[in-house]
Each structure stands twice: as structure tokens, then as C-alpha cells.
């Protein structure tokens, strides 16, 4: 993943006016072992405008679109049984949780030493994946039964939006963390610290909201299925 991002970033940088000179300088520096051992050099590369734009496009735009589709694949493969709404929700939640587990094992984009922040990212990210996949799975179930694509499209858009907001906040924290390492005490450090705090508060609120949304959706689906069951028996 890191290699792919580097290739994309270099390709984008080559299109900028000064991109060729920056690439030549980077290739020269990569041949120096001392330059490679200095973490500040990697931070400077990540903060280059072409690299930042590439990271935002990949993690905030492309990743949500692709991953929300990928999480629907297991549900679609099992849909030959034409699941009920509650069953589709459970399948979606399980697909999202499984995806989050794999992502947590291999995701090394943001290395954080604070245990509470790590737990927030893991719990919030897993909840986001589960809710998004659950909503999309219910949209898929509605499409199979009623042949109306609008609910599926709407659920997919909601899932992608939630995913993009979460990833945007995480990428923002990563960028602010890199900026903070190169700033000295003063207004600049205060601004970066305040920005990181605001994004952390946003992630906390998102996590609480995502958990509440899963509880609410589960309750509503159960109520709908109970109503249908009572109508079928009368």
C-alpha cells in the first residue's frame, strides 16, 4: 500500500511545474543511507502538496467508494437465500466487522503511542465499517425484494459519506501530527494542537453517534419484522 501511494504521489508530483526538480532531488536523497535514517525527511515528503493531495484522494475519496462496495460482496454472494431485512442487517454488520478486523491488523498509516487514541481509532473505525456495511446490506435486500435501486443507492451514499468523514478526520490528525513535530513552542504549535484536539473530539462524537445508530437501526428493524410477523398471523 505504501509503495502504491509513493508511485501515485510521484506521478502526481511530476505533473506540477516544479515536480520534476523535486523528483530528481528525492531520487538523489534516496541513495543516501543517512538521509533515509532521518524520520524528518519522510515527514517532509509526506507534507509535500502533491503527496498530501494524493493521500486525501486515496483515503477520503477512493477508499470509501471501493471499500463500501467490497463489504457488500459477501452479502451479495449469500443473497441466493433471499434474506429477510434483519438477516441482511446481521450479514452486513458481520461483513463490516470482519473487514475492520483485517484492516486493523494491516493498517500502519497512523502510528500513535497514546493508548486511548489507538482504542478510539480501532473502536470507532470498526463501528463505522459495521454500520456502513449493515446499511448497504439492507439496501441490497430491499433491491432484491422490491427491485427499487433507490434505497440501495441511498444506503451506499450514506455509508460512503460516513466513511469519508471518518477517514478525513484520521488523515487530518496524521497531517497535524507531522506538522507538530516540526514546530517549536509558540502560536504555530498551539494552532496544531488545537486542530488535533478538535479532530479528536469529532472522532469521539462520531464514535458515539455510530454506536447509537447501530442500536437504533437494530431496534427499528426488529420492530418492522415484528409488525410483519403479527400481520402475517392475522
Regions found by a protein language model. Give the residues of each.
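Hydrophobic alpha-helical segments at protein termini of multi-pass membrane proteins
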Residues: 1-234
Amino acid at each position: 500500500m505504501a509503495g502504491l501511494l509513493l508511485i501515485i504521489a510521484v506521478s502526481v508530483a511530476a505533473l506540477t511545474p516544479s515536480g520534476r526538480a523535486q523528483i530528481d532531488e528525492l531520487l538523489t536523497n534516496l541513495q543516501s543511507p543517512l538521509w533515509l535514517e532521518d524520520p524528518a525527511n519522510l515527514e517532509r515528503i509526506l507534507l509535500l502538496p502533491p503527496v498530501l493531495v494524493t493521500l486525501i484522494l486515496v483515503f477520503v475519496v477512493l477508499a470509501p467508494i471501493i471499500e463500501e462496495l467490497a463489504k457488500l460482496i459477501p452479502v451479495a454472494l449469500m443473497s441466493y437465500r433471499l434474506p429477510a431485512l434483519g438477516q441482511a442487517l446481521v450479514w452486513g454488520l458481520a461483513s463490516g466487522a470482519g473487514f475492520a478486523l483485517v484492516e486493523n491488523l494491516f493498517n500502519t498509516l497512523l502510528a500513535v503511542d497514546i493508548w486511548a487514541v489507538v482504542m478510539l481509532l480501532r473502536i470507532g473505525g470498526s463501528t463505522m465499517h459495521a454500520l456502513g456495511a449493515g446499511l448497504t446490506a439492507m439496501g441490497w435486500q430491499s433491491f432484491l425484494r422490491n427491485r427499487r435501486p433507490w434505497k440501495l443507492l441511498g444506503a451506499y451514499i450514506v455509508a460512503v459519506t460516513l466513511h469519508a468523514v471518518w477517514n478525513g478526520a484520521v488523515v487530518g490528525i496524521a497531517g497535524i501530527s507531522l506538522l507538530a513535530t516540526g514546530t517549536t513552542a509558540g502560536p504555530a504549535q498551539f494552532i496544531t494542537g488545537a486542530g488535533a484536539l478538535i479532530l479528536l473530539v469529532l472522532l469521539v462524537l462520531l464514535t458515539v453517534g455510530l454506536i447509537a445508530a447501530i442500536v437504533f437501526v437494530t431496534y427499528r428493524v426488529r420492530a418492522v419484522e415484528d409488525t410483519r410477523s403479527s400481520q402475517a398471523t392475522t
